[in-house]
Design a protein with these regions (language model features):
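Short acidic, Gly/Pro-enriched loop/turn segments at secondary-structure junctions
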Residues: 35-40, 55-73
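Anionic N-terminal interaction surfaces
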Residues: 1-26, 31-33, 42-49, 63, ...
Length: 104
């Protein structure tokens, strides 16, 4: 199966900062962004998160005012939780879970 981009959005992750969250048919990636205030340009930086969907163990939403799309993923020394501030939290959580279910 070829990898296809399903969703992409500017977001903020609690520990990683500002960036672009991308969901594909095979993985979740987070690319750091750099902004320049003088000309309002935004530049993609390095990919600092690249998680195969098969390593995602749990997806959920949390927050009352500042809602977050959350995932837990297996990493080399255990498990890590990431919390992304995205526009449509429910849509992101559902789409991530649907992409994981499609792997099976």
């Amino acid at each position: 199966m070829d990898e296809k981009k399903l969703k992409q959005e500017d977001c903020y992750e609690d520990n990683l900062g500002q960036g672009v969250l991308t969901l594909t048919t095979k993985r979740i990636a987070f690319d750091k962004t750099r902004s320049r205030i003088m000309d309002f340009s935004k530049h993609m930086g390095e990919t600092i998160l690249d998680i195969p969907l098969s390593d995602v163990t749990h997806t959920w939403r949390e927050g009352l005012l500042m809602k977050k799309a959350c995932i837990s993923a297996r990493i080399t020394n255990g498990e890590q939780t990431y919390k992304f501030g995205v526009f449509n939290v429910g849509g992101w959580v559902d789409d991530i879970q649907d992409a994981i279910d499609e792997l099976d």
